[in-house]
Amino acid sequence: MKKFVILIPVYNDWESLKKLLININENIQDIKNVKFDCIVVNDASSIENSELIVPSNFSSIKIVNMNENRGHARCNAFGIKFLSKQSNFDHLILMDGDGEDRPEEIKNLVDQALKDPGISVVAKRIKRSEGPLFQLLYRIHKYLTLFQLVS
């Protein structure tokens, strides 16, 4: 049986995470011969999280805490490093904790990964729900970040 780990970074938005986990749970229930675990990377949230109930289709949900707020990409890197030390999984699925990524697509990702285990399967978000101001500021942020990396 193949094991997939769903890695989700979260910062303060525990309610969205709970809704996301319920939605993921509903979407993985019909996937056969696959085991799902979930790693939640807490990006040093300032809001306490209430207990997360493990939905029935997950083998486990583990929260890994970062010492300081480092942002979404660092959370993913931290989670991947944490998982690399375990090596008891076959595939990794990265999802945002804000609900922007569609759990309905997990089945497609799993199907593709199982069809050809030697390849990496990636998905691209076609449409973001943020408005034009956010998109403009995000582009400026990316430019400034790239400028800092190159300098």
Task: Please annotate each region the language model reported.
Residues 32-45:
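Short beta-strand/loop segment that forms part of the nucleotide-sugar
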Residues 66-68, 72-82, 100-151:
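Acceptor/aglycone-binding surface of glycosyltransferases and processive sugar-polymer synthases
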Residues 7-9, 40, 65:
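Short hydrophobic beta-strand elements that form part
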Residues 42-51, 99-100:
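A conserved acidic beta->alpha catalytic loop
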Residues 13-17, 45, 102:
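Donor nucleotide-sugar binding loop of glycosyltransferases
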Residues 3-5, 37:
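Cell-envelope/extracellular polymer assembly enzymes that use nucleotide-activated donors
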Residues 13-29:
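Short, well-formed alpha-helical segments that are part of the catalytic scaffolds
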Residues 88-100:
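Short beta-strand-to-loop acidic/aromatic patch adjacent to the donor-nucleotide binding site
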